[in-house]
Amino acid sequence: MLPGIKTAALSPEASFDCGTLVPNGDDWTTDFNAIKCNDQLKVNAVLNQIHGRTHLGASRAPVPSIFGMNFQAVSVGQKLIEPASAVRTDANTGGYEDAQATPRPKMLAEIQFVDAAIGQMVAALKHEGLFDSTTIIITAKHGQSPIDPNRFFPIPGKSGNNGTPPSGIIGNFLPAVYNDPNNGLGLAEDDISQIWLANSNRTADAVAALENAATAIGLGQIYYGASLNTLFNPPGVPENPGPCCKLREGGDPRTPDIVEIPNYGVVYTGNLKKQSEHGGFAWDDTNVMLLVSNPDIEARTINSFVETAQVAPTILKILGLDPKALDAVRLEGTPVLPALFNAGDHNDK
């Protein structure tokens, strides 16, 4: 329970009293209201900071030049089914009604909560006379796939009969440590499968096994070898490990040996509590909103392609700092977001 915490809402009757929350032993992400309470704790910390206090509100503190938080409510609302059931209804299911992303009532409530919570921050900024000098950036690190509920196809599914995930096909190629149920390690399998092999020299054999089981795993596309290296550093163990994040000879252990992308709508799960997932390359995963607000910025829609990686250098430029102070900006040539500064600034490297 979180006594004294009420969730933000667009109307009083929509607010949830977190003091009435009775945890059932699961985490915050297993309940539509619990995730709002979790987010509201973070919102309250930001509100305290705006009002010139520590995040707990216990004492005075300088207002930060930059602050932010991560909302989980919309992400959870997109994929959660609670109570878990093979039958999805408006009473137990978030996500969307159709392929055009019409939100179900549970999902709409999560969106409205986040809307109201951001409204609390805006109101606090105005109260403290900070709104006119503040830029607000709202975006997402990922979406959820599939948006269309009719395309959701869990493998193996609760019945276990919908197919076999890649880990079930190439178990003999995987490190033995994955077999220990207590080590917390395993493949990253959601709406994508990222595979680290016990022996990278057997990559071609593992790929052949996956392709032979294409129907069972819902195979869409496989990246390995040269095709994988066009996206990431080559997989492997560095010959001479250097400082963090430097490119190193001999391979990068963060890169899997194989990346398998299933057909659209396939999610590797046997869990009845989810109807979508993230982490993959699907359009629903990677196409997210990005809103920048400042009283000096004219309201308009920018239709040019941008990436969320551009947010970080944009923040530095807004603060009067050099975006090139970031290694990634220098190495990858990441520009600031377009149309926010003087003409030509969006081409800054």
Q: Can you name each region flagged by the protein language model?
A:
Residues P64-Q72, M107-L125, F131, T135-G143, ...:
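Beta-strand elements within well-structured catalytic alpha/beta cores of enzymes
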Residues S159-N212, S276-G320, P335-A343:
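Substrate-binding rim/cap in mid-to-C-terminal beta-strand-loop elements of soluble/periplasmic
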Residues M1-A58, E332-P338:
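Active-site-proximal alpha/beta segments of enzymes that process anionic O-linked groups
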Residues Q120-T135, T139-V266:
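Secreted, luminal/periplasmic, and some membrane-associated catalytic domains
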Residues A14-T30, R53-T54, A58-F113, N150-F152:
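Active-site His/acidic residue clusters
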Residues K36-L41, A101, P105-A116, S200-A204, ...:
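Soluble non-cytosolic domains of exported or imported proteins
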Residues L2, H51, A58-V63, F67, ...:
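Extracellular/periplasmic catalytic domains that process cell-envelope and extracellular macromolecules
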Residues D17-T20, V76-I81, S145-P149, T203-A206, ...:
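Extracytoplasmic/secreted cell-surface and envelope-processing proteins
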